[in-house]
Amino acid sequence: PYGTKSPASIARYACQAAALLQRRDIKLLVVACNTASAVALDALREQMRPLPVIGVVEPGAAAAVDARPAGRHLVLATEATVRLGAYREAILGLDAGATVDELACEMLVALAEVEQRRGSVAETFAGVIGGDGAVAVSASILID
């Protein structure tokens, strides 16, 4: 788990993993980790050039805005993702009328990592926080 690591460590780990994949002659890299996308996407794009590198923050933010235009969104994510404000920036970049709150929630990350991020986990967090709808995005849940 990257969430409590320093940005330098996260970028180093992500770039090392990408280098291993690059040796396998991949055609595209999807960075399917919110924290790695928030911290290391630019470094990965530079390292993997000319291959396309796609992160999950921008598509996740777009899904949240599509689900709740001008809505209030709560981002539950790793400490690093929250500290960087990646979702806040991406959501507000798409919808200046949105409200974005962020909360570091390492327990949710642990649940997601054991593939319990659907159904009851998302519903439990929505109920605890008082949300009436949730869009699950990797290890983050955006709730309005």
Question: What are the residue ranges of the model-derived segments?
Answer:
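Non-catalytic structural scaffold of enzyme domains
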Residues: 1-144
